Amino acid sequence: MKVRRNLLIALSLLSISASAQRIKGSDTVLPVAQQTAERFMNQHPDTRVTVTGGGTGVGISALLDNTTDIAMASRPIKFSEKMKIKSAGEDVAEIVVAYDALAVVAHPSNPVKQLTRQQLEDIFRGKITNWKQVGGDDRKIVVYSRETSSGTYEFFKESVLKNKNYMASSLSMPATGAIIQSVSQTKGAIGYVGLAYVSPRVKTLSVSYDGTHYATPTVENATNKTYPIVRPLYYYYNVKNKEQVSPLIQFILSSDGQDIIKKSGYIPVK
């Protein structure tokens, strides 16, 4: 009996040490989630963490369906999503793991250096259609956006468009990387991406919300709040799984985890 009890204890410990966790959702959070998960697995070799994107809405839907343990989100969970969880007798916890600046990007050859929030609203709503209307070349503006399931799509709509609708002819991209690629190949293009995705292939534009003070999207400007388009990034998990996910969440909030976040182009919470 004692041998059997010891065997059961050993098997229980093995199942804990060899635990697997699934993280799914926001493409904005994806790069830093992958990096922190890799470091976590290096420190805990018996733990496997899988990280996949798809968008905030996809991640939260997966959390509702119990096909992920943690949902990455670049927007707060919606009331309707919370109600679905509560109707199933469950509860969800929210953790802010980082902050992100949303950069407005254009083709590198574009001479325009800055735009106001109102100009951005008019561009993404189709009221401004040519770059010459904002001091640029006589060239049609090609608007790239994220698809509607994206938290970045919803945040940009809320912060920049003041909850007005995007123009019907904007080109919806399935992932942030697709916006970078499309904007880098299209001279009249404009789009928006998380700061960590910015590369020399595109040009970032300075933005002003008051029409006077312009700021470029950098970690420093986002941290000191001179750059206006900044939002929190979230991890959501089912409260009943707290014990399982806590070690990973504690790691991303630790000094090591927050250091990874800062080096990756995000703004730490601590």
Question: Which residues fall in each region the model found?
Answer:
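Hydrophobic h-region of N-terminal signal peptides that target proteins for export
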Residues: L11-S19
